[in-house]
Amino acid sequence: PRCYRYCKNKPYPKSRFCRGVPDPKIRIFDLGRKKAKVDEFPLCGHMVSDEYEQLSSEALEAARICANKYMVKSCGKDGFHIRVRLHPFHVIRINKMLSCAGADRLQTGMRGAFGKPQGTVARVHMGQVIMSIRTKAQNKEHVVEALRRAKFKFPGRQKIHISKKWGFTKFNADAFEEMVAQKRLIPDGCGVKYVPGRGPLDRWRALHAA
């Protein structure tokens, strides 16, 4: 509901003081071909939040399913990797009111109004990435459309942004292949290892001899 959209309270995570929290609806945060090597999927699209708000775990789950369905249909089930970048750790509460007649015994109104845990939400800042998709460069339109469809599951305003970075790495796409060729980056699964320009010379020689 609308009242759970705004970040009014301090973060209230599940802890030994906050017990009996229902499980978050979203359980899977990575979909598609998540084992794909870093050089297979150079293009990366982000959905970026434009508001400081809370997104429920139900909304995250709905958006994840929606984006996944469209990407599977358009790019094949092995043609992409979606990652949900938010995790719902903040617990929201509800002060249960009994509305039926004859509920005089439990109807306390605002006496003892600290609520019981109802569900979990993720707190998102302005400019924070909600969801990312990496895929091949020719699938750019599909990425934008998948994120556009997933946007309808969230309150507030989101922007879709095609990243300048290579896949899910932090290195710019135009310099990425050159850095790999110079062995300044070593592909490692869906990420890369950065080789700094300092350290023992024999390690550098061993790397370049390989």
UniProtKB/Swiss-Prot annotation:
One GO term of the biological process aspect: translation
Matches recorded under CDD domains? Ribosomal_L16_L10e (cd01433)
One GO cellular component this record assigns the protein to is:
cytosolic large ribosomal subunit
> InterPro entries annotated for this entry?
Ribosomal_uL16, Ribosomal_uL16_CS_euk_arc, Ribosomal_uL16_dom, Ribosomal_uL16_euk_arch, Ribosomal_uL16_sf
Keyword annotations of the record: Cytoplasm, Developmental protein, Ribonucleoprotein, Ribosomal protein
GO MF, one example: structural constituent of ribosome
Assembly, per entry: Component of the large ribosomal subunit. Mature ribosomes consist of a small (40S) and a large (60S) subunit. The 40S subunit contains about 33 different proteins and 1 molecule of RNA (18S). The 60S subunit contains about 49 different proteins and 3 molecules of RNA (28S, 5.8S and 5S).
The record's PANTHER family line, in alphabetical order, gives: 60S RIBOSOMAL PROTEIN L10
Q: What does this protein do?
A: Component of the large ribosomal subunit. Plays a role in the formation of actively translating ribosomes. (Microbial infection) Seems to bind to the leucine zipper of viral and cellular JUN.
Task: Supply the name of the protein.
Answer: Large ribosomal subunit protein uL16
Give the originating organism: Gallus gallus
